[in-house]
Amino acid sequence: MSAASASAAVKQKVEAPVHPMDARIDELTDYIMKNCLWQFHSRSWDRERQNAEILKKTKELLCGEPVDLSTSHDRCYWVDAVCLADDYREHYPWINSMSKEELASLMQGLKDRMDYLTITGSLNEELSDKHY
């Protein structure tokens, strides 16, 4: 590894978030990483918005809460959230027995993990390229 690469790696080092439901968050994260293309936006601000909006709407769906569909962006995120919530209910049956508070905590932990993996912990320099 060159000195410049090592310097960039040290500069970008961010600690992974720790959460009491880490094992379950790992399962949900693994599903997203293998099945969801929305995680691959080329700019960090796109990834931040996607993670926040899709996972917020997924939480609302899992908790049986109303979902804002007032804008075209909201509806776009909602479509991904519906697919994700349905898949989580099918593939991870334990999610169906969680309380709203547990689901909210789980989904916040998942969002924090996704932000770390796709944005703050990523060494992809294109994420912060202003000309990209």
Curated annotation (Swiss-Prot):
Pfam hit, one: AnfG_VnfG
Enzyme Commission (EC) number: 1.18.6.1
GO annotation, biological process: nitrogen fixation
Catalytic activity: N2 + 8 reduced [2Fe-2S]-[ferredoxin] + 16 ATP + 16 H2O = H2 + 8 oxidized [2Fe-2S]-[ferredoxin] + 2 NH4(+) + 16 ADP + 16 phosphate + 6 H(+)
Molecular function as annotated in GO: ATP binding; iron ion binding; iron-sulfur cluster binding; nitrogenase activity
Domain of life: Bacteria
UniProtKB keywords: ATP-binding, Iron, Iron-sulfur, Metal-binding, Nitrogen fixation, Nucleotide-binding, Oxidoreductase
Quaternary state and interactors: Hexamer of two alpha, two beta, and two delta chains.
Function (record text): The key enzymatic reactions in nitrogen fixation are catalyzed by the nitrogenase complex, which has 2 components: the iron protein (component 2) and a component 1 which is either a molybdenum-iron protein, a vanadium-iron, or an iron-iron protein.
Protein name, as recorded: Nitrogenase iron-iron protein delta chain
Gene transcribed to yield this protein: anfG
